[in-house]
């Protein structure tokens, strides 16, 4: 399985909180940091509430980065999520096998890694950030590793291709609907993120528009325009996140179009997925993993299975046919409801 993207403080694609390092003063500091791969220098602000507290990288406004034209992904050296993207997949697996052997080999034999048939475009949840350029152009993309500087992404080799197309359309609609993009430094603007969740087996797609305010002008017209361009979309939800946080999804949802959730099938079981619910981002490999775990558990339909931190209960429900009883333990009420 390919490495997931790390988005500089955003959960990964819940894929990974990078920070600007420890800070020792209560006041906010500004640091200059040089990146050899860019040939430029970026200003990164980090906030602190006390000693030895990890500061959250704030928005970096420099666009001085260099693409790598010799790479399959021209920004892989900057986003930090796909360090192995230019390796043949068999070599990727060999490198990961070597790493796992080094970690666990002293404790016993290590089985061979089970690879994917198609290790590309597997990710069923995609999160995009946006920025308005001085020219007025809206770019969408991911955060450069360790910063909140947005790197434009046209095609990501781990993300669902339909999700990528929807994100491109939404960036165009931001401009045509004259919506303001949220600025982390000033706390102004409306659009924080766009998150796409895809049911790989059902084909259902949920679009989550994360806003900094519940007031969202023309949201129904915007949703209609998005669905017209992409009729495969089954629901559009406004998620409201008014906090000064690096977390993408807030606590409040307002359904704009459709049911407000999607469904997918995993291990032969049907699951409901809401905006705040955790669901494995690589469902193909998840089925392989769960199948192995259930096989090794060797259940005889006499046991009680406790699915701790269960989310929407995928592991416990997948094992339910072989257990006498399944108990799921979860704090997230939305996940329990699903």
Please tell me what each predicted stretch does.
Residues 3-18, 22-28, 37-41, 48-49, ...:
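Rossmann-like S-adenosyl-L-methionine
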Residues 66-71, 78-181, 201, 216:
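Extended interfacial segments that mediate partner engagement and assembly in macromolecular machines
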Residues 82, 194, 236:
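Residue-level signal for inorganic ion chemistry
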Residues 124, 203-205, 302-303:
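Nucleotide donor/acceptor-binding cores
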Residues 152-154, 158, 163, 167, ...:
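Accessory substrate-recognition/RNA-binding modules or partner subunits associated with SAM-dependent
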Residues 156, 192, 197:
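RNA-binding accessory domains that recognize and position tRNA/RNA substrates
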Residues 181-188, 305:
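Short helix/loop segment immediately N-terminal to the Walker
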Residues 196, 202-212, 270-274:
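Short, aliphatic-rich beta-strand segments
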């Amino acid at each position: 399985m390919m490495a997931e993207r790390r988005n500089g403080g955003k959960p990964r694609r819940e894929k990974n909180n990078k920070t600007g390092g420890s800070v020792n003063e209560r006041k906010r500091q500004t640091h200059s940091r040089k990146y050899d791969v860019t040939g430029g220098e970026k200003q990164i602000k980090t906030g602190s509430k006390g000693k030895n507290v990890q500061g959250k990288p704030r928005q970096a406004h420099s666009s001085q980065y260099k693409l790598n034209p010799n790479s399959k992904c021209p920004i892989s050296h900057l986003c930090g999520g796909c360090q192995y993207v230019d390796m043949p997949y068999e070599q990727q697996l060999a490198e990961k096998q070597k790493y796992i052997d080094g970690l666990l080999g002293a404790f016993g034999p290590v089985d061979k890694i089970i690879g994917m048939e198609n290790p590309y475009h597997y990710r069923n949840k995609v999160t995009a950030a946006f920025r308005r350029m001085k020219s007025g152009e809206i770019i969408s993309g991911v955060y450069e590793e360790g910063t909140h500087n947005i790197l434009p992404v046209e095609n990501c080799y781990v993300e669902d291709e339909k999700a990528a197309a929807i994100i491109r359309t939404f960036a165009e609609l931001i401009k045509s609907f004259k919506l303001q993009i949220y600025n982390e430094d000033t706390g102004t603007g409306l659009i924080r993120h766009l998150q796409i969740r895809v049911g790989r087996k059902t084909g259902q797609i949920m679009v989550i528009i994360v806003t900094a305010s519940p007031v969202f002008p023309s949201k129904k017209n915007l949703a209609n325009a998005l669905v017209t361009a992409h009729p495969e979309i089954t629901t559009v939800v406004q998620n409201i996140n008014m906090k000064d946080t690096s977390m993408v999804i807030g606590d409040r949802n307002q359904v704009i179009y459709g049911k407000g959730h999607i469904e997918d099938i995993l291990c032969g079981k049907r699951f409901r997925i809401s905006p705040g619910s955790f669901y494995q981002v690589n469902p193909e490999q998840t089925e392989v993993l769960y199948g192995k775990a259930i096989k090794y558990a060797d259940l005889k339909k006499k046991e009680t299975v406790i699915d701790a931190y269960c989310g929407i209960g995928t592991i416990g429900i997948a094992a339910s046919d072989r257990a006498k009883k399944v108990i799921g333990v979860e704090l997230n009420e939305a996940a329990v409801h699903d």
